[in-house]
């Protein structure tokens, strides 16, 4: 059974002005998502600025999220690293805290071979024990998981069960689905490609959009799963201007501004990320207004 179906939020991490984690606002965000249609919380991923967290902060954030979610919706922890040993340690600790799964990005910078990725993910999955969601995002990592690599892992490692696909390579994704024969749960990693990915057998999305429009992201997925493909596509297309505004600069710069504009939490970013440019802020504000998120 899938860890979740629908829209999981790639949740932002609220920081105070001094850049410490704002756990009070994170608690409020967790309640917001549990009450507004989000199907899963994915903590400490790209949108959560995990790359600029210490390992101690990372694990404290995971532990807090599991405790505060209280089983209302599944929690998936980003525990990826380009160091296999570190990824193993983070994944095991997250599993000990009670996460429902871990999200594991391909080893970045090292540019591992396909053989190296198989070794990496096999070792990490063995340490984690909980379900593993692979994360293919070559635009950030510098390496791509081939369909055959994904199929080998899914077919040989019992707890590697899903993939977040942000490559945009639909031919490779289709091949993955063919080679795994129903054993791979596919999630879109791109909000503007939810419906296309679901047409290949996808279960939903791990979403930036969900940070500000959780019901819309959920509805795009659920309508498709209910066989209402036209309605799903219509909502996907309606959301495109907002989605594009959320990616005017590198994620999570725009979405951090968006949650600030909605009053959900502060927009503080950790360096080297910098505040959204004023002209982009105005575009974002306009699209949020058009979508009914702010006045």
Task: Cite the ranges covered by each PLM segment.
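Active-site beta->alpha loop and helix N-cap motifs at the rims of alpha/beta catalytic domains
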Residues: 2-9, 13-142, 152, 294
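C-terminal alpha-helical cap/extension of soluble enzyme domains
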Residues: 6-14, 36-38, 199-200, 206-295
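Short, amphipathic alpha-helical "lid/cap" segments that border enzyme active or binding sites
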Residues: 23, 27-30, 147, 281-288
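A general structural signal for well-ordered alpha-helical segments in protein cores
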Residues: 26, 58, 62, 87, ...
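Secondary-structure boundary/capping positions in well-ordered alpha/beta enzyme cores
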Residues: 72-73, 131, 160, 183, ...
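Helix N-cap/beta->alpha junction signal
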Residues: 83, 190-191, 277
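Catalytic alpha/beta core domains of metabolic enzymes, predominantly
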Residues: 126-127, 140-247
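Glycine-rich phosphate-binding "P-loop"
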Residues: 136-137, 159-160, 270-271
């Amino acid at each position: 059974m899938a860890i979740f179906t629908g829209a999981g939020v790639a949740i932002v991490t609220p920081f105070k002005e001094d850049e410490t984690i704002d756990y009070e606002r994170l608690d409020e965000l967790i309640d917001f998502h549990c009450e507004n249609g989000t199907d899963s919380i994915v903590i400490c991923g790209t949108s959560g600025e995990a790359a600029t967290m210490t390992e101690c902060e990372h694990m404290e954030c995971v532990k807090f999220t599991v405790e505060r979610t209280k089983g209302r919706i599944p929690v998936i922890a980003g525990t990826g690293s380009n160091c296999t040993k570190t990824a193993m340690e983070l994944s095991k600790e997250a599993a000990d805290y009670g996460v429902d799964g871990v999200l594991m990005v391909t080893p970045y910078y090292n540019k591992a071979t396909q053989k190296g990725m198989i070794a990496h993910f096999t070792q990490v999955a063995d340490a984690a024990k909980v379900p593993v969601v692979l994360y293919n995002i070559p635009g950030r990592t510098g390496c791509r998981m081939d369909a055959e690599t994904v199929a080998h892992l899914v077919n040989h490692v019992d707890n590697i069960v899903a993939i977040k696909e942000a490559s945009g390579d639909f031919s490779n994704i289709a091949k993955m689905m063919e080679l795994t024969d129903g054993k791979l749960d596919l999630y879109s990693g791109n909000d503007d490609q939810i419906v296309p990915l679901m047409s290949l057998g996808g279960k939903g999305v791990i979403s930036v959009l969900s940070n500000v429009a959780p019901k819309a992201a959920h509805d795009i997925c659920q309508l498709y799963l209910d066989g209402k493909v036209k309605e799903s596509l219509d909502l996907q297309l309606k959301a495109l201007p907002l989605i594009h505004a959320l990616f005017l600069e590198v994620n999570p710069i725009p979405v951090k501004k968006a949650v600030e504009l909605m009053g959900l939490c502060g927009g503080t970013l950790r360096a080297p990320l910098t505040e959204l440019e004023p002209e982009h802020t105005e575009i974002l504000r306009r699209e949020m207004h058009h979508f009914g998120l702010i006045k």
